[in-house]
From Swiss-Prot:
The organism of origin for this protein: Danio rerio (Zebrafish)
Gene: rimoc1
Keywords: Autophagy, Cytoplasm
Cellular component GO terms held in the UniProt record: cytosol
Stated role: Plays an important role in the removal of damaged mitochondria via mitophagy by controlling the stability and localization of RAB7A. Required for the recruitment of RAB7A and ATG9A vesicles to damaged mitochondria and promotes the stability of RAB7A by inhibiting its proteasomal degradation during mitophagy.
Localization terms from the record: Cytoplasm, Cytosol
Pfam families tied to this protein: RIMC1
One of the GO biological process terms: mitophagy
Protein known as: RAB7A-interacting MON1-CCZ1 complex subunit 1
């Protein structure tokens, strides 16, 4: 009973902290859709706590809390993108956003230890948390990639961002276990079966593959001429192998079942010709 109360209080504290943050951000842009949605959910959560809700609702509270985090950080990310990631403030702001997007998963594991995190938050929210962190680092690295002089002075930092981004995006692809084709599931066409077997469940999964391929390409480009990193060799990702494997799947999907659906493979093929 005491543990349940402690968990509920911890989440309540975070909710009211987010409410203050959301209110401050709304003074910048009152009509922002994401901040309005976050504010609406926060009002519901505050009402719940004021009326002494049941602790058994903790998973649902965590899901709502996670959606608030996603909405608020999306607004903050858009500000960074619009400002083209200022060199002086972006590193700190990005680490802050990554921490904010990690907290729901950490809280779910700590506050509902008897259940797996993906059961508490749900597959879609957990996927979104990984996607958002990986996509943020992709956008940041895409901008840095155009700042050649900056990279010359900060290769290790650039490679670290690429490695973190690829790890997050790979985790996103692994949230849903690939469907086994012999587990009794009946598919109406082989294309659907192949998609699910490869872990491709949506357009976002395909875009994730392309992002991974590009980030691996950038890493290989600079990793070959920057071996002074202090990270242990066994902890580094094999960017060339990962990029090649992921982009092969991407091209096969886009030129196979998805042919004519607007997916372009020219860039993927060009990267593959360099990685292989």
């Amino acid at each position: 009973m005491a543990d349940d109360y402690r968990r509920s209080v911890e989440l309540e504290r975070r909710i009211f902290e987010l409410d203050n943050k959301c209110a401050t951000l709304r003074t910048e842009k009152p009509d922002d859709d994401y901040l309005q949605n976050a504010s609406s959910i926060l009002d519901k959560l505050k009402t719940y706590y004021r009326h002494g809700g049941e602790s058994s609702s903790l998973p649902k509270l965590l899901q709502d809390y996670t959606q608030v985090v996603l909405d608020i950080t999306f607004y903050e990310e858009n500000k960074l993108v619009d400002q083209e990631f200022p060199e002086d403030s972006s590193p700190f702001k990005i680490q802050q956003l990554l921490q904010d997007l990690t907290e729901p998963e950490v809280l779910a594991g700590r506050l509902v230890p008897a259940q797996e995190v993906q059961s508490v938050l749900g597959l879609e929210l957990l996927e979104c948390l990984y996607w958002r962190r990986g996509a943020l680092l992709y956008m940041y690295c895409h901008t840095l990639h155009q700042r050649k002089q900056w990279i010359k002075k900060n290769k290790a930092t650039f490679l670290k961002c690429l490695q973190e981004g690829v790890r997050y995006l790979m985790r996103m692809l692994q949230v849903r276990n690939s469907v086994k084709l012999n587990d009794g599931v009946v598919f109406h066409d082989s294309a659907t079966a192949n998609f699910l077997a490869e872990g491709i469940f949506s357009d976002t999964h395909l875009l994730t593959m392309m992002y991974i391929g590009e980030m691996c390409f950038w890493a290989v480009k600079y990793e070959d001429c920057s071996m002074d990193t202090t990270e242990r060799k066994e902890d580094r990702l094999h960017f060339r192998d990962i990029g090649t494997q992921i982009l092969h799947k991407y091209v096969l999907a886009c030129e196979g079942p998805l042919q004519g659906q607007g997916w372009n493979t020219e860039n993927a093929k060009e990267i593959l010709s360099i990685l292989q």
